[in-house]
């Protein structure tokens, strides 16, 4: 079947790059009409983007896992924004194609490999610096399903290592363990009557 690509946002159309996604989808379908289906939540009307209604998080996670191969995030804003929707899609096993105007990939020490494709925008953040490169990335996944599957697993593994329950809960478990099995006298946050 066709490559399944998705973009989602509920914010400002321009800041989130929804217009860029519509342009990308239209350019892809012009070149390879049968190679991909493009889903969009919050995307401007486009003849090639299948609109999807916003859904609750559990339903969205299930949708990503069952219906999406590549998640596209085209943030223009920069500082103050991360990849929350991209991280959710990666946790579901989707390959991520994203802008990184805030430098999240390197600044936070992620430095993902080729299974997270960083998309460059022009200096004014109005358009893609090289839309042909983005189209080639997507077409590569449409024609090489083995690579798509490998990159989806790597993206999911990386996402769980960074944002999965074990990674998020580890500091809490360490704190609780130090309270239950202290090597030194318990600090105020561990004391039995600390909240009285």
Predicted regions span which residues?
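Short alpha-helical segment that forms part of, or immediately flanks, the ligand-binding pocket
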Residues: 61-62, 84-91, 105-106
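Conserved catalytic-core segment of nucleotide-activated headgroup transferases in glycan assembly
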Residues: 1-55
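A charged, aromatic-enriched C-terminal amphipathic alpha-helix characteristic of glycosyltransferases
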Residues: 146-177
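A short alpha->beta transition loop at the rim of the catalytic pocket in nucleotide-sugar-dependent
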Residues: 69, 91-94
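Conserved active-site histidine-acidic residue motif and adjacent donor-binding/catalytic loop
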Residues: 42-68, 76-82, 102
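Short hydrophobic beta-strand element within catalytic cores of glycosyltransferases
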Residues: 95-98, 105
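Conserved donor-binding loops in enzymes that form glycosidic bonds
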Residues: 7-13, 75-76, 121-124
């Amino acid at each position: 079947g066709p490559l399944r690509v998705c973009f989602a946002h509920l914010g400002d159309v321009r800041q989130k790059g929804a217009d860029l996604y519509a342009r990308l989808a239209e350019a892809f379908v012009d070149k390879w009409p049968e190679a991909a289906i493009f889903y969009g939540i919050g995307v401007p009307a486009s003849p090639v983007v299948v609109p999807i209604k916003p859904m609750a998080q559990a339903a969205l996670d299930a949708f990503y896992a069952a219906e999406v191969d590549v998640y596209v995030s085209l943030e223009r804003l920069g500082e103050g924004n991360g990849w929350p929707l991209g991280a959710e899609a990666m946790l579901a096993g989707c390959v991520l194609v994203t802008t990184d105007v805030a430098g999240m990939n390197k600044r936070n020490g992620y430095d993902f490999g080729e299974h997270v494709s960083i998309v460059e925008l022009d200096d004014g953040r109005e358009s893609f610096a090289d839309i042909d490169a983005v189209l080639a990335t997507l077409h590569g996944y449409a024609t090489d399903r083995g690579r798509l599957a490998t990159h989806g697993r790597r993206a999911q593994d990386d996402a769980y290592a960074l944002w999965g329950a074990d990674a998020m809960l580890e500091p809490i478990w360490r704190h609780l363990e130090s309270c239950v099995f202290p090597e030194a006298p318990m600090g105020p946050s561990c004391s039995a009557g600390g909240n009285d």
